[in-house]
Swiss-Prot record:
Assembly, per entry: Interacts with replication protein 1a.
Enzyme class, spelled out: transferase
Keyword Calcium part of the UniProt annotation: no
RdRp catalytic domain: residues covered: 511-624
Organism: Cucumber mosaic virus (strain Y) (CMV)
Protein name: RNA-directed RNA polymerase 2a
Length: 857
C-alpha cells in the first residue's frame, strides 16, 4: 500500500513530518527495491550452452551459463539473499561499491560504464547465484567482485586460459593496458593550503619576511620550462591564477612532463638567449621592410644626368671662373657593397654640383625674425645664458690652461700633411675674410622614405687654411674646456675629455623629453647671433681684442671653390669648417633655449651643436615660437619626444645608469656605403671595420630591458616596427665579431687570383718557346742577325727564354707587390702549367697562348 507523501505546509514543516523519512517510508522503499530486483532476476534468461574449443573465441557480448546448468531461472531465495545487503545501503555507499567491483573508467565527470542502480543490484544477485550453482565446467570462475563486473559489462565469467596455465589469477577486466595506468579518482576540493613562514608562523603572503619581488625575479630568471619539457596539458591555468590561491574554484590541472637531458656543454647565462641566425639575406630583408624606397635606389649615373642636362639656378652675387678648373683626380676604385641600403656614391665637386649645394646651404637666407634692438636684447640673452648655465664661483676661480700644449698637439696632428712651424703666416698680413669652400663627398644617410622623389644634396664646408686654423684652434679649445668646467651639474656637453653621454645614476625612464629640431641652422644666423656670441666670449674670459677681431671678419666674407670655379660673398652666417664652428653653434643653441624655456624645470639638459635634449619630471613649459620670431630659426618641437640626440638613443640599464646607442637605422645604411677605397691588403676596409666596432661597443651592455626600450623609442621616432631594431642588433653583433664576417658585406669587381701551392720545391722554372708564325702575326719577327737584346718580360719574344724565379727574385714589374705574389714566388710547380701574364703585372690583355707562346714547366 502506497502512502501519500505529506503535503508542504507550515504545520507539517514545524512538526517535522515534511522532508523527513519515517520508518514506514523506509520500509516501503526497501520493499519496492526488493520487488524490482526479483523482477529483474525472473526476467533474465541466459543463452543455451555452447561448446567452446580452444581455437574459437567467445562472443564478448554474449552471456551463457556453465555446461549442465539448469535452464530454469535462479530461485528467488538466492536473489533475496544476494540483494538484501545492498538494498539497505545508501546511494553513496552503492557508488563506492560500484567503483570497487566494476572499476569504471572516469572520463572527465563521466563513468564508463555508467552507474545503474537496478543493473548493479541484479549483477550482484546473479553473481551470488552463479557461485552457489553446481560446478560443471572445468574452467575457473572469477571471484565475486570480478564476476559482478563481468555480469555488469556482459563479458566472460571465467578467467583466461593463459592465466590458468601460469597458475596466476589475473584480472583481465582491470584494464592494465601497456603504457597506461588507471586509478580511481578521488574527489578533492582543489584547495591548496598556503605556505607558512617558519620564522613568524604566518602565511607567507602576509608575513614581513616574504619577499614577493624576489620570488618574481627568481621565477623570471629560471622557469619550470628550463628543466622540464611539457608533453601534454589537459588544461591551462596561468601563474597569476595559481598564485592567487582561489582554493576550491581552481580546476585541477593534469600535466605530463619529461625530464630534459643534462646538457653536455654549459652555456653562460648571458648567452642563453634564443636568437635567429643572421645572414646577409636577413639584413637585406630588414632594409627592404624598414626603408622601402632605399632598396631599389641606385645613383650611379645621377651626377652624369645633372652634368649633361639643362641647368637653371637663381643666385645673387655669384662669380664663375671656368678657365682654371682642377680636373678630377682618378682614384683606384671603391669596394662594392652587397647590401643595398640607399647609400649614394661619392659626389664630385663640379660646377653644377657646387652651385646646387650653395643654393641649399648658403644662399636664400630666411628672414623670419622681427625687428628688435640688437644691442640691448643681445646683452639680455647673454645674461640669461650665464644665469641659467654657468656657476659663477667656478668661472671666477678658473683660468686658461693648456693653450700652448694644444697648439703643439695640433701641429703634431697635421705634421704628416706638411704643416710645419716655418709655414705659419702672420695673421695681420692675411685677409681672414677669404674662406675656401668645398662640398662633402659623403652624403648623410637619409632616413625618410623620399629617395624615390628627392635627390639628397651634399653639405658644404667653409674653412680657413690649416696654417690659419692652427693659430685660433688652441685658444678656442682651451676656452671650451674652461666653459665645460664652469657649467652647472645638470648641463652636459657630450664632447671632450671631461664629458660624454654616459650618465651614471640617471634614469631616462618615466621622464618627459623635450627635443627641438632647428632647420637651416648655419645660414639662419645673423648679426643678432654674432652679438650674442661676442658677449658670451667676453664673459667667459676670452681677450676682448681677439673676440672683436674674430667677429669682425665674420660679418662679411667671401667664399670660393677653386675646383669648381665658383665664388660668392656671404655675411654673418656660420662658417662650417673654422676653429669656432662647434663651440659657436653650441652656445647659440644654449642661449636660444634658455630664452625660450626656464632651465630650472629640467633635471638634465644636453647640448651638442644644433642638437638639444631636456629631461623633466613634469611636462616642460615654454614658448618655442620665439625660436622663429626672435632668433630667425625654423624650429620644430619633436612629438612624440624620445631621448635622442646626436643620432643616438639614450637607454638606461637595470642599475639606473644611462648610456648611448647609435641609431640602428643609420648604422644599417652605413653597412652599404660605397665610399670605401679599394686596396690589395684591405687596409681601408679594415679601418672602416674598426670604426664600426668602436661605434657599437655598447652591444655588451644591451640586456633584454634595454632592447625593449630601444624598440619602443625606435617605433615612436620613425613610426616603424620596433622588432626590426632588435633584428638589427643581431646583425651588428655578428659583423662586429671579426673582420672576416665584416668582409662578407663588400666585394670588388677587380679580378683577384689566389695562387695556392703545397709543393716544397725550392725553385720554379718557366721555359717559353715562341713560334715564328705567331711572332709574325703580332709584328715581332726579327732577323737572325739582329743583335738587339730580347726583352725579358713575361712573354717578350725571342727564340727561347729561360726564367728562374726564386724566393729572392721579383716576378713582375709592379711597384707594390701583393701577398699573393710573395706566396707565388716561394713555391714551385713541377707539373705542366699555363701562367697568365696578368698575374705578373706585365700584360693585362691577352693570355700567353694568344701571344704565340708555349709554356711548359
Amino acid at each position: 500500500m502506497a502512502f501519500p507523501a505529506p503535503a508542504f505546509s507550515l504545520a507539517n514543516l514545524l512538526n517535522g513530518s515534511y522532508g523527513v523519512d519515517t520508518p514506514e517510508d523506509v520500509e516501503r522503499l526497501r520493499s519496492e527495491q526488493r520487488e524490482e530486483a526479483a523482477a529483474a532476476c525472473r526476467n533474465y534468461r541466459p543463452l543455451p550452452a555452447v561448446d567452446v574449443s580452444e581455437s574459437v573465441t567467445e562472443d564478448a557480448h554474449s552471456l551463457r551459463t556453465p555446461d549442465g546448468a539448469p535452464a530454469e531461472a535462479v530461485s528467488d531465495e538466492f536473489v533475496t539473499y544476494g540483494a538484501e545487503d545492498y538494498l539497505e545501503k545508501s546511494d553513496d555507499e552503492l557508488l563506492v561499491a560500484f567503483e570497487t567491483m566494476v572499476k569504471p573508467m572516469r572520463i572527465g565527470q563521466l563513468w564508463c560504464p555508467a552507474f545503474n542502480k537496478c543493473s548493479f543490484i541484479s549483477s550482484i544477485a546473479m553473481a551470488r547465484a552463479l557461485l552457489l550453482a553446481p560446478r560443471t565446467s572445468h574452467r575457473t570462475m572469477k571471484c565475486f567482485e570480478d564476476l559482478v563486473a563481468a555480469i555488469y559489462t556482459k563479458s566472460d565469467f571465467y578467467y583466461s586460459e593463459e592465466c590458468e596455465a601460469d597458475d596466476a589469477q589475473i584480472d583481465i577486466s582491470s584494464r592494465d593496458v601497456p603504457g597506461y595506468s588507471f586509478e580511481p579518482w578521488s574527489r578533492t576540493s582543489g584547495f591548496e593550503p598556503p605556505p607558512i613562514c617558519e620564522a613568524c608562523d604566518m602565511i607567507m603572503y602576509q608575513c614581513p619576511c616574504f619577499d614577493f619581488n624576489a620570488l618574481k625575479k627568481s621565477c623570471a630568471e629560471r622557469t619550470f620550462a628550463d628543466d622540464y619539457v611539457i608533453e601534454g596539458l589537459d588544461g591551462v591555468v596561468d601563474n597569476a591564477t595559481l598564485l592567487s590561491n582561489l582554493g576550491p574554484f581552481l580546476v585541477p590541472v593534469k600535466c605530463q612532463y619529461e625530464k630534459c637531458p643534462t646538457p653536455t656543454i654549459a652555456i653562460p647565462p648571458d648567452l642563453n638567449r634564443a636568437t635567429d641566425r643572421v645572414d646577409i639575406n636577413l639584413v637585406q630583408s630588414i632594409c627592404d621592410s624598414t626603408l622601402p624606397t632605399h632598396s631599389n635606389y641606385d645613383d650611379s649615373f645621377h651626377q652624369v644626368f645633372v652634368e649633361s642636362a639643362d641647368y637653371s639656378i637663381d643666385l645673387d652675387h655669384v662669380r664663375l671662373r671656368q678657365s682654371d678648373l682642377i680636373a678630377k683626380i682618378p682614384d683606384s676604385g671603391h669596394m662594392i657593397p652587397v647590401l643595398n641600403t640607399g647609400s649614394g656614391h661619392k659626389r664630385v665637386g663640379t660646377t653644377k654640383e657646387v652651385l646646387t649645394a650653395i643654393k641649399k646651404r648658403n644662399a636664400d637666407v630666411p628672414e623670419l625674425g622681427d625687428s628688435v634692438n640688437l644691442s640691448r636684447l643681445s646683452k639680455a640673452v647673454a645674461e640669461r645664458f650665464f644665469i641659467s648655465y654657468i656657476n659663477g664661483n667656478s668661472l671666477a676661480s678658473s683660468n686658461f690652461v693648456n693653450v700652448v700644449s694644444n697648439f703643439h698637439d695640433y701641429m703634431e696632428k697635421w705634421k704628416s700633411s706638411g704643416l710645419s712651424y716655418d709655414d705659419l703666416p702672420d695673421l695681420h698680413a692675411e685677409n681672414l675674410q677669404f674662406y675656401d669652400h668645398m662640398i662633402k663627398s659623403d652624403v648623410k644617410p637619409v632616413v625618410s622614405d623620399t629617395l624615390n622623389i628627392d635627390r639628397p644634396v651634399p653639405a658644404t664646408i667653409t674653412y680657413h687654411k690649416k696654417s690659419i686654423t692652427s693659430q685660433f684652434s688652441p685658444l678656442f679649445t682651451a676656452l671650451f674646456e674652461r666653459f665645460q668646467r664652469c657649467l652647472r651639474e645638470r648641463i652636459i656637453l657630450p664632447v671632450g675629455k671631461i664629458s660624454s653621454l654616459e650618465m651614471a645614476g640617471f634614469d631616462v625612464k618615466n621622464k618627459h623629453c623635450l627635443e627641438i629640431d632647428l632647420s637651416k641652422f648655419d645660414k639662419s644666423q645673423g648679426e643678432f647671433h654674432l652679438l650674442i656670441q661676442e658677449h658670451i666670449l667676453n664673459g667667459l674670459g676670452c681677450p676682448a681684442p681677439i673676440t672683436k677681431w674674430w667677429c669682425d671678419f665674420h660679418r662679411f666674407s667671401y667664399i670660393r671653390d677653386r675646383r669648381a670655379g665658383v665664388g660668392m660673398p656671404i655675411s654673418f652666417q656660420r662658417r662650417t669648417g673654422d676653429a669656432f664652428t662647434y663651440f659657436g653653434n653650441t652656445i647659440v643653441t644654449m642661449a636660444e633655449f634658455a630664452w625660450c624655456y626656464d632651465t630650472d624645470q629640467f633635471e638634465k639638459l644636453l647640448f651638442s651643436g644644433d642638437d638639444s635634449l631636456g629631461f623633466s619630471l613634469l611636462p616642460p613649459v615654454g614658448d618655442p615660437s620665439k625660436f622663429t620670431t626672435l632668433f630667425n630659426m625654423e624650429a620644430k618641437v619633436m612629438e612624440p619626444a624620445v631621448p635622442y640626440i646626436c643620432s643616438k638613443f639614450l637607454l638606461s640599464d637595470e642599475f639606473g645608469n644611462t648610456f648611448s646607442v647609435p641609431d640602428p637605422l643609420r648604422e644599417v645604411q652605413r653597412l652599404g656605403t660605397k665610399k670605401i677605397p679599394y686596396s690589395d691588403n684591405d687596409e681601408f676596409l679594415f679601418a672602416h671595420f674598426m670604426s664600426f666596432v668602436d661605434r657599437l661597443k655598447f652591444l655588451d651592455r644591451m640586456s633584454q630591458s634595454c632592447i625593449d626600450q630601444l624598440s619602443i623609442f625606435f617605433e615612436l621616432k620613425y613610426k616603424k616596427s620596433g622588432e626590426e631594431a632588435a633584428l638589427m642588433l643581431g646583425a651588428f653583433k655578428k659583423y662586429t665579431a671579426n673582420f672576416q664576417s665584416y668582409k662578407e658585406l663588400y666585394y670588388s669587381d677587380r679580378r683577384q687570383c689566389e695562387l695556392i701551392n703545397s709543393f716544397c720545391s725550392t725553385e720554379f722554372r718557366v721555359e717559353r718557346v715562341n713560334s715564328n708564325k705567331q711572332r709574325k702575326k703580332y709584328g715581332i719577327e726579327r732577323r737572325c742577325n739582329d743583335k738587339r737584346r730580347t726583352p725579358t718580360g713575361s712573354y717578350g719574344g725571342g727564340e727561347e727564354a729561360e726564367t728562374k724565379v726564386s724566393q729572392t727574385e721579383s716576378t713582375g714589374t709592379r711597384s707594390q707587390k701583393s701577398q699573393r705574389e710573395s706566396a707565388f714566388k716561394s713555391q714551385t710547380v713541377p707539373l705542366p702549367t699555363v701562367l697568365s701574364s696578368r698575374w705578373f703585372g706585365t700584360d693585362r690583355v691577352m693570355p700567353p697562348c694568344e701571344r704565340g707562346g708555349v709554356t711548359r714547366a
